[in-house]
């Protein structure tokens, strides 16, 4: 490990270097997904996900209040409006019933749902994805606390349109 770190420090390629490419390939293979992009931090990953989906001023993003500040910071950074919904008392993960209620009652056009997986437990993505499909909304999974978990042999990273981790 020390030799690998020294190699990165010696060649000065912190961005787009061979180690980053290897990391992205390994991450994709581990999560059984097609692509991975290394970012400097989880906040930047969330911002890039929102930008990739062309989310900005006038758009709403449904998420939860029980999260690290980066979730809301990313939404506001692109000019979108956070639309907060309640979580399950038992898991603190987003409640899909509240998501659908928020979509129907929102004053802004909802363009994405951003579940935040907590304590190693992925959100209820099957239900969330059904709602997203019904309303033609994208799902951005924040898997900073669940990466490595799986449900029915499907790895976190493969449940949403875009998943971020840090």
Where are the regions that the model predicts?
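Alpha-helical elements of Rossmann-like donor-binding domains used by nucleotide-donor carbohydrate transfer enzymes
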Residues: 4, 22, 26, 48, ...
């Amino acid at each position: 490990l020390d030799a690998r770190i020294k190699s990165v420090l010696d060649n000065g390629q912190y961005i787009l270097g061979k180690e980053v490419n290897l990391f992205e390939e390994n991450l994709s293979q581990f999560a059984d997904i097609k692509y991975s992009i290394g970012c400097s931090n989880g906040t930047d990953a969330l911002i890039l996900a929102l930008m990739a989906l062309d989310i900005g001023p006038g758009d709403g993003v449904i998420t939860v209040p029980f999260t690290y500040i980066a979730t809301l910071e990313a939404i506001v950074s692109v000019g979108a409006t956070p639309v907060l919904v309640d979580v399950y008392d038992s898991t603190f993960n987003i409640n899909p019933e509240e998501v659908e209620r928020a979509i129907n009652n929102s004053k802004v056009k909802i363009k994405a749902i951003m579940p935040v997986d907590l304590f190693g437990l992925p959100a209820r993505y099957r239900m969330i994805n059904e709602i997203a499909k019904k309303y033609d909304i994208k799902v951005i999974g924040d898997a900073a606390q669940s990466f490595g978990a799986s449900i029915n042999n499907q790895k976190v990273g493969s449940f949403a349109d875009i998943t971020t981790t840090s």
